[in-house]
Amino acid sequence: MTLQQQIIKALGAKPQINAEEEIRRSIDFLKSYLKTYPFLKSLVLGISGGQDSTLAGKLCQMAINELRAETGNETLQFIAVRLPYGIQADEQDCQDAIAFIQPDRVLTVNIKGAVLASEQALREAGIELSDFVRGNEKARERMKAQYSIAGMTSGVVVGTDHAAEAITGFFTKYGDGGTDINPLYRLNKRQGKQLLAALGCPEHLYKKAPTADLEDDRPSLPDEAALGVSYDNIDDYLEGKTVPEQVAKTIENWYLKTEHKRRPPITVFDDFWKK
């Protein structure tokens, strides 16, 4: 088995999908989890205005709507959380995503004050954060807020990780990578677009250039610029297609060096890092 085949198998990626079937699969997955643990009353997700959180948010609300109708339990809710750092450049996209999702509840937590306070405390301890590390601080503060909300609403934190993101480890460890449940896991980027199109999402929300937008020095830096490879290339690779040799090397290098991000904390029983 080639490394490409191993990666595809590990991430559960498929060369082709039926959008309606995958929508149903994700909704049923979320419903099944909540039914298994009836003490859970909410799904909590940060909404950025990008493709992934828009899709995950819509699926969450659909799952909650169905579960309420089936059980008569009106305490179930989907909580969409806006988490800007100061003023967000693409705020209108966030509002458009909220309008599309129609969440039960919308909370806004501006993380800038918390991030600056943490940065100042570290500075006083003799640690000056780089712009890159400050970006990770933002991602972790966003997740911290979501877990606080989930803790107060008997909820679970929903993630947006998918195969095209997992393969490169393009997420912050214990930031956006630290969630309870991931309904998009297995899909690549173009497949996520297919689901949103099937759901009637406004095109500009999934045709915009994806960006983590964490760095102050490089605002709205496109993911593809940071990765050095396009999502089309990544999706082709995940679909088992032949890609240029350098593209394959770039993708595989990202995969191998970020393996620790896709695993629980390393113990004495692990040896993947020795290979």
UniProtKB/Swiss-Prot annotation:
CDD domains from the UniProt entry? NAD_synthase (cd00553)
Q: Which residues bind ATP?
A: G46, I47, S48, G49, G50, Q51, D52, S53, T160, K189, T211
Under Enzyme Commission nomenclature, its number is 6.3.1.5
* A GO BP annotation: NAD biosynthetic process
Positions contributing to Mg(2+) binding = D52, E165
Q: In which pathway does it act?
A: Cofactor biosynthesis; NAD(+) biosynthesis; NAD(+) from deamido-NAD(+) (ammonia route): step 1/1
Q: Which UniProt keywords apply?
A: ATP-binding, Ligase, Magnesium, Metal-binding, NAD, Nucleotide-binding
The UniProt GO MF terms for this protein read: ATP binding; glutaminase activity; metal ion binding; NAD+ synthase (glutamine-hydrolyzing) activity; NAD+ synthase activity
Listed transmembrane segments: none
The reactions it catalyses are: deamido-NAD(+) + NH4(+) + ATP = AMP + diphosphate + NAD(+) + H(+)
Record's GO cellular component terms: cytoplasm
Q: At which positions is deamido-NAD(+) bound?
A: R140, K173, D180, H260, K261
Subunit and interaction comment? Homodimer.
- Outline what the protein does: Catalyzes the ATP-dependent amidation of deamido-NAD to form NAD. Uses ammonia as a nitrogen source.
Tell me which family the UniProt entry assigns to this protein. Belongs to the NAD synthetase family.
Q: What is this protein called?
A: NH(3)-dependent NAD(+) synthetase
Natural source organism: Escherichia fergusonii (strain ATCC 35469 / DSM 13698 / CCUG 18766 / IAM 14443 / JCM 21226 / LMG 7866 / NBRC 102419 / NCTC 12128 / CDC 0568-73)
As recorded in Swiss-Prot or TrEMBL, the protein's gene is named nadE
